[in-house]
Amino acid sequence: MTPQSLYKVPSDIAENALVNNDQYKKMYQESIINPEGFWREHGKRIDWIKPYTKIKKTSFDDHNLSINWFYDGTLNASANCLDRHLEEHGDKLAIIWEGDDANEQRKLTYAELHTQVCKFANALRSQGVNKGDIVTIYMPMVPEAAVAMLACARIGAVHSVVFGGFSPDSIAARVIDGKSKVLITADEGIRGGRKIPLKRSIDEAISNPDVTCVEKVIVFKRTGGDIDWVEGRDVWWHSLMEVASEFCQPAEMNAEDPLFLLYTSGSTGNPKGVLHTTGGYMVYASMTHEYVFDYKADEVYWCTADVGWITGHSYMVYGPFANAATVLIHEGVPNHPTPARLGEMIDRHKVNILYTAPTLIRALMAEGKEQFSSYKGDSLRIMGSVGEPINPEAWRWYHEVIGHENCPIVDTWWQTETGGILISPLPGATDTKPGSATRPFFGVQPALVDNMGDIVEGTGEGNLVILDSWPGQMRTVYGDHDRFALTYFKTFRGMYFTGDGARRDEDGYYWITGRVDDVINVSGHRLGTAEVESALVSHELVAEAAVVGYPHDIKGQGIYAYVTLTRGIEPTEELRQELRQWVRKEIGALATPDLIQWASGLPKTRSGKIMRRFLRKIAANEVTNLGDSSTLADPAVIDTLIESRLNKTE
């Protein structure tokens, strides 16, 4: 590792951080050697109605799979996010909201948010919602989305948030699986200057003949646009709130009572409902938010994720509110109407902590540094990355242009299934390397195993597994515990299989190499697609790249690259050859792409995740049955890629 590629903890951060490197090592060691003692102490960071005496009862045996934390304690998640802050922080801002139009802004204190949540919790009860019922939420990025979630938690209902861009079929599948009687939506959302017909999508979902459970649809009036209305079923949010009481006693929930369902996106077949429970999740979301972002009282924290994803749940709602944070919520996208929007919002709201995704960083990179010429960024202290491995070139650009080389970057690795961050730098403790998620959080025991399940010691590469449970871990796949065991615990017995590959370097740092199915076997040698993608994107003319394997007569698999060039650059055969040589130089001859297809856009979900299964099929010339593309932000991208594919057979 060259000295230039190691970014030391800034001295001012180290002096004032929650933990330094020595403290991290001591706490981590304790959390592994004595997990019960460690979590017995740190479980106290949230408020309990009946304090726990039992800490951990877990088994990763796929025949006897069970995960229980703090399991004789009782609590309420909503009370932990609101009530416990009222005495000291009632007047503190809980939410700063900025609309798609920057001129539209709202602010809510903790006392005001508490009132809204209590009233809506009573409104839900008036519509027949009881403890244990699953309520489907399909909302835009407005404060009422968080209000709806916290109101469900307050009365012991289980929320199932569906991202506000999913298709009616996707909504229907989730409603059917959860048997939701009550749905919560808005007339329309606004995103990137466009109106999103949320209520229309809900109406279409309910018209599915298999949806027979829905009794009520609560509609928040966001735009006032024309919508269809079903008398007796549809009810306005504001009408319910006008008559709802401001007092709602929080329900006493067992630590292992369900808090929410969140369905994993992009899976084939039936949706997979990831079930998270109350106690362990709240402890873990709260603790990781404070330690990973080194959160200090009175700081403004901005997570750009949508509430429909796990990042929005853990690091826009439950973690920050449990810590009495001031949370910036943005309705739109941070590069609309211009790429300067991100910087403008950081300056306008004096944001101290920013948590965003590599896909946005690369999009901003492609627009050029000049978009940030008037950006000050002097309030910013910590920056985070989430959603996929960040390539080193994007990491450095983020560090230089957004962070002015002063802000540590926490490159966080975790999953919907993990509930919270598992591997990440801590700002005051961890020297960072661009592209590495670095070291595990407290209580997390990662390991690498080969394809036979044998542990890889020291430096090496393999399948990333976790050897023991942590409090934020999912408990089951809703309604299908066998599927939970099969998906995560049968591949490598007695271990949680993440589905990702990773390598560990000489410093014990972890580098996520991508999904295991994103590994290409070229002439018997394994290559992580993320590595080839990073090499391509490090070229100054490349904005984005996605790499997949395809059948090759000689090598077994060849390397097929989809490349998006920076704005204004024309694709040429000369540039294609230059990029092949560039990768050869960066990684080695083995990694040289066999085929490079120019791509004006890549197939992405609305959260920015590249859907590689489409790219693999197109590269393999299997274009007649690509499967459901309804979750893509722009399904038309697929047709363009098919038309210009390079592996056609006549």
From Swiss-Prot:
**What Enzyme Commission number does this protein have?**
6.2.1.1
Q: Which Pfam families match?
A: ACAS_N, AMP-binding, AMP-binding_C
Residues annotated as coiled-coil are: none
* Repeat is among the record's keywords: no
Q: Provide the binding site for Mg(2+).
A: 537, 539, 542
**PANTHER family per the UniProt record, alphabetical:** ACETYL-COENZYME A SYNTHETASE
Q: What is this protein called?
A: Acetyl-coenzyme A synthetase
Organism this protein belongs to: Shewanella frigidimarina (strain NCIMB 400)
